[in-house]
C-alpha cells in the first residue's frame, strides 16, 4: 500500500468488515488495508468480494474473502473462526452488512419485510458482536463499529422498519460499550446520511435522478455523501486515536438531523 501520514494506524492489526463487497463496506475494507491492516472481506457475493481482495492485494496489502450471510449464525461463527485461523487474532470489526427492505407506511408493511430487515440489521449485528467480542478479548482488546443510520435517531416516512432496526443497532451498541468498557473492547456506531451507494439506488432506482436530487437537497451541506467519507469516520472510531471513545454514535449526514 502507498504510504501516507496515517499509513501505520492499523499496522499489525486484523480488521473484519461485513457487507464489504460494495459501497461503504468496500471503501472501509480498502481504507483499513491502506493503513496497514490485514483485512477479512465478508459478504454474500463471491465475485464482488474477491474483486475487493484483488484491489487490496494488487496495491500491496493483505486480505482474504469469506462468503458470509449475516442472517445465518453459522456463517458468522465460521467467519470469526476463519479470521482467527488465518491471522491469529481479531482487533477491529466493522459490522456494516444491512438491508433497506421495502419502503411503505407502517399500515402497509408486512411481517415478511419486518423479518428480513431485522434479521440482517439487528440479529446480524447481535450475532457479529456475540462472536467478535470473545475473539477480541483473546487478542487483548479491540474496537467494533456498527453501521447504524441517521434514521437511528429520527423518524423518516416510509422507512419505518429500517428506522426501527437502526434504533435497535444504536441501543445494542451502547449496551455492549458499557459491558466491555473495562475489558478493552470499544463499541461505537457510525450513522450515515444519504450516501451514494447501491442501497440508495435500490431505494430510488439507479436512474431516478429527481429523487436523488431531492434527497441531496434535504442535506444542508447540499449534496449526498460518499462511501469514502463514511469510511474515514469508521477508521477514526476504530483507531487508537479514539481510545477514549466508546458508546458513541458518530453521525455523518451533512447536518441532515440537525436541520
Residue positions per predicted region:
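Short C-terminal tail/terminal secondary-structure segment
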Residues: 2-6, 100-103, 154, 234-235, ...
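Conserved glycine-rich cofactor-binding loop
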Residues: 14, 21-22, 45
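Catalytic Tyr-X3-Lys loop
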Residues: 107-126, 145, 169
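C-terminal substrate-recognition "lid" of short-chain dehydrogenase/reductases
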Residues: 126-129, 137, 223-252, 257
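Residue(s) in the substrate-gating loop at a strand-loop-helix junction
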Residues: 149
Amino acid at each position: 500500500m502507498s504510504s501516507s501520514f496515517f499509513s501505520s494506524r492499523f499496522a499489525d492489526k486484523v480488521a473484519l468488515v461485513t457487507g464489504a463487497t460494495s459501497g461503504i463496506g468496500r471503501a472501509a475494507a480498502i481504507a483499513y488495508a491502506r493503513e496497514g491492516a490485514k483485512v477479512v472481506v465478508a459478504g454474500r457475493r463471491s465475485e464482488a468480494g474477491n474483486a475487493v481482495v484483488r484491489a487490496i492485494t494488487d496495491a500491496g496489502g493483505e486480505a482474504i474473502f469469506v462468503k458470509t450471510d449475516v442472517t445465518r449464525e453459522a456463517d458468522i461463527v465460521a467467519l470469526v473462526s476463519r479470521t482467527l485461523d488465518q491471522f491469529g487474532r481479531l482487533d477491529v470489526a466493522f459490522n456494516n452488512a444491512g438491508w433497506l427492505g421495502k419502503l411503505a407506511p407502517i399500515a402497509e408493511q408486512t411481517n415478511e419485510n419486518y423479518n428480513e430487515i431485522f434479521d440482517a440489521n439487528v440479529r446480524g449485528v447481535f450475532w457479529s458482536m456475540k462472536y467478535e467480542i470473545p475473539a477480541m478479548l483473546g487478542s487483548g482488546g479491540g474496537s467494533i463499529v456498527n453501521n447504524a443510520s441517521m434514521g437511528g435517531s429520527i423518524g423518516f416516512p416510509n422507512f419505518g422498519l429500517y428506522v426501527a432496526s437502526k434504533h435497535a443497532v444504536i441501543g445494542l451498541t451502547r449496551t455492549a460499550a458499557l459491558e466491555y468498557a473495562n475489558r478493552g473492547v470499544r463499541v461505537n456506531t457510525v450513522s450515515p446520511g444519504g450516501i451514494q451507494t447501491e442501497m440508495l439506488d435500490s431505494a430510488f432506482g439507479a436512474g431516478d435522478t429527481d429523487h436523488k436530487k431531492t434527497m441531496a437537497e434535504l442535506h444542508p451541506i447540499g449534496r449526498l455523501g460518499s462511501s469514502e467519507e463514511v469510511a474515514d469516520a469508521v477508521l477514526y472510531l476504530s483507531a487508537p486515536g479514539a481510545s477514549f471513545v466508546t458508546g458513541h454514535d458518530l453521525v455523518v449526514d451533512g447536518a441532515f438531523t440537525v436541520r
